[in-house]
């Protein structure tokens, strides 16, 4: 049995242990705000290469670890990474984002999708996760991540990022049987992918349903929640002790429903006050978040004040400190350092109420 002190701090919190301070990491903590990342990107301009070449992905994942020592190290990857293994090719065009051509629009295309075999199509993921575990040891928790079915379907059906999601919503409201079939196939594939990440070394896995906040609560219950539950249920059948986190951008309208997904931790965006989020989700649900990424453009005193306010509102236990979205491009690295340093001193700066 591994002793508590041999278990990484974030993993202990994710399992429900009461600690002196909330663990801390940042979504997109490896990325364009860091000069070392930009230098590497200039040398290797293809995002697919940076995220699928193990040596590059490992190096990028470890850049913020070396700079700031976060309590979580998340593998550098993309939510679309498993799609080619299902028969959905994609590319990522710098400054434009993902492109899927041809997009998935017909029943025949959905029927022709193949089950995901990550050993065959995603072997680099094993190398990345195993290496990260080896590099950070028990000093940090290694996180994996996946896209949730609605968001992956939105990319695949729209063919690119979208502002209004008219094409997938058109399918949802005029040909729902095609969409439900597609969502179920994605859910099965993502459950396999999460299990694979855990088997390869991920200690916590975050599900990103980034675009589910674009759904009305009624449609969220029809097209997003059941497939989140399908993924979580299948993962928990085989890996019941691995904590799962769910993040949705613009989640204020569906926050309680996120708690119904079966995940262990709900990642709250900054549009909800953390005290209110705690009340709406109930004290038994652990939370993550939820500093506005824009706060990191403020003064360091302002950053510290916002961190203390959020931690105070979250209360003691069951909280992982994070942003309410990814780090923004152009964020000063010194302010990111201030964020992490303050977070690690929270217990001294603040008597956290029970």
From Swiss-Prot:
Q: What is its main location?
A: cytoplasm
Species for this entry: Crocosphaera subtropica (strain ATCC 51142 / BH68)
- Please identify the protein, giving its name as recorded: Uroporphyrinogen decarboxylase
* Catalytic activity annotation: uroporphyrinogen III + 4 H(+) = coproporphyrinogen III + 4 CO2
Q: Which InterPro entries match?
A: UROD/MetE-like_sf, Uroporphyrinogen_deCO2ase_HemE, Uroporphyrinogen_deCOase
PROSITE patterns in the cross-refs: UROD_1 (PS00906), UROD_2 (PS00907)
A GO molecular function annotation here is:
uroporphyrinogen decarboxylase activity
Q: What is an annotated GO biological process for this record, any one?
A: protoporphyrinogen IX biosynthetic process
Q: Can you quote a single GO CC term?
A: cytoplasm
